[in-house]
């Protein structure tokens, strides 16, 4: 094998992802390759956000499959039919992003969690959530600072910022409810061997 740079790996990973979803942003490939927390823009690239990464996440799987292109189309339709509301949500999201970047730097779990829940409310307004997602978010509320859809929406998983003081109880109770779930930490290294 020849040694590949991280940028080469990202290019190859994006090409592979495009076989499934032609308009992939490349964000997932980039964060997996570089690790940590990043700010990502499809045209502008990425910038690492320095954070102590001192938190635990819970991933819950709804078991519902979805098609990213269908969900993206729903967002596009919402935007075209609700231009003012969509613009307002984008402006709110810009403020939210600024606040959460600072919260990541400070490792402020309460602000990060509140921001995740706020973002979920915006996704609800756009229409890419569903009853199963809402049920999971309500269920994890007692164990997390906040939670939201991860990925395209319309199914798939949610991600919750865990309160580690009751993580064991959270995992037991979520599994009793027959949810596939697991806890994770953020890997700050990313890809280190290929």
Which role fits each region the language model picked out?
Residues 156:
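Conserved glycine-rich beta-strand-loop-beta hairpin in the small C-terminal domain of fold type I
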Residues 1-6, 11-23, 29-148, 159-194:
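C-terminal nucleotide
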